Amino acid sequence: RVVSDNSGKACGTCPACECGDFMLCEHKTGLGLDNNYKVFGGSGGFTKYAKIPGGILRLHPHAIWEIPEGVKYEEASVLDPIANAYKAVAQQSSLIPGQDVVVFGTGPLGLFSVQIARIMGAVNIVMVGLQEDVEARFPIAREVGATHCVNASTEDVVKRCLEICGRDNLGLVIECSGANIALKQSLEMLR
């Protein structure tokens, strides 16, 4: 029983790979995407079994982790979004306690980012989602630490987030939705 860190197929020669950050490889082919179906032998990100290229272990010996006995698959499956949220919010951002945070995307990565921002001392934590998130995901976001939820389907996201946070106290914007419009809005609200 193992789990991959989803380094996928990294080149090993670009600047990111040379620094050991294989997730940022310029030529990386990720696991479970339609455009690389054949690269991984038809394995997707949510299949029970996936073929991981052995070459990644020569580059990154810790690309595959053994799941300890007693840890269920369901528990192990959340390690990826938790680790990614932790790396983004706690290790790579310059968030200072007392600043505000905006998180785009109400999936596991976004929800874990909210939790970590709360632990790190963020004051206003704004979760941005869509109409379908109002009943299902927004209550969870509030439960794990979001102070405000903004419905991008009905509200001017940039205006509303800046009303809540103010441009000067907005310390971090995290984009977890994958939507182009969210990336554009993220950049608009930054100093």
Residue ranges, per PLM feature:
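NAD(P)H dinucleotide-binding glycine-rich loop of Rossmann-like/cofactor-binding domains
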Residues: 11-104
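N-terminal Rossmann-like NAD(P) cofactor-binding module of classical short-chain dehydrogenase/reductase
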Residues: 3, 171-174
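Helix-to-beta-strand junctions that scaffold the AdoMet/dcAdoMet cofactor pocket
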Residues: 190-191
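Conserved amphipathic alpha-helix within the SDR
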Residues: 157-167
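Hydrophobic beta-strand signal
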Residues: 2-4, 102
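Glycine-rich, N-terminal phosphate-binding loop of Rossmann-like dinucleotide-binding domains
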Residues: 6, 153, 177
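Mid-domain Rossmann-like dinucleotide-binding core that forms the NAD(H)/NADP(H) cofactor-binding site
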Residues: 48, 69-155, 159, 172
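Beta-loop-alpha module in the N-terminal Rossmann-like domain of NAD(P)-dependent dehydrogenases
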Residues: 176-185
